[in-house]
């Protein structure tokens, strides 16, 4: 079984991030990330894992499992599945810095904003469906 550091490196590389980029996005020092990945430091504390999970745009629970803090990951919750699909789609088109994927931006939205976003998303989705039917 791969160590936590090896798994962290694989996740970072899958997202085509450098150690310095992950450090910038997470607030965890580049040296700290490097030590974790190279096995020179033990498993980080849950607070550090949370920062890394958010920067990697993966569920915190999944990274806690990889770190050995929890024994099983319960079935993925719908919001995580949706976010993962959105992330996969963005990565397929090499769109790395979409505001839509930034957790901190969501905190400012109220109910009306979310309903408007849902309406706009439905419109865009319907238009895309029409375009794909025409192809």
Curated annotation (Swiss-Prot):
Gene null: resulting phenotype: Cells lacking this gene display a derepression of rapG and rapH expression, which leads to a down-regulation of sfrA that in turn leads to the expression abolition of both comK and the late com operon comG.
Q: CDD domains in the record, alphabetically? A: HTH_XRE
Q: Write down the Gene3D superfamilies for this protein, in alphabetical order.
A: lambda repressor-like DNA-binding domains
Per UniProt, what is one Pfam family of this protein? Answer: HTH_31
Coiled-coil-forming residues are none
DNA-binding region, residues: 19-38
Molecular-function GO terms, alphabetical: DNA binding; DNA-binding transcription factor activity
Q: Any one Gene Ontology biological process term?
A: regulation of DNA-templated transcription
Q: Which InterPro entries match?
A: Bact_TransReg_Diox (IPR050807), Cro/C1-type_HTH (IPR001387), Lambda_DNA-bd_dom_sf (IPR010982), RghR (IPR016759)
Q: Tell me the keywords, alphabetical order.
A: DNA-binding, Repressor, Transcription, Transcription regulation
Q: Which segments constitute the HTH cro/C1-type domain?
A: 8-63
Domain of life of the native organism: Bacteria
**Keyword Repressor appears in the UniProt entry:** yes
Q: What does this protein do?
A: Represses the expression of yvaM and both rapG and rapH. Binds directly to the promoter regions of yvaM, rapG and rapH.
Q: What is this protein called?
A: HTH-type transcriptional repressor RghR
Give the species this sequence originates from.
Bacillus subtilis (strain 168)
Q: What is the lineage of its organism?
A: Bacteria, Bacillati, Bacillota, Bacilli, Bacillales
Designated gene of the protein: rghR
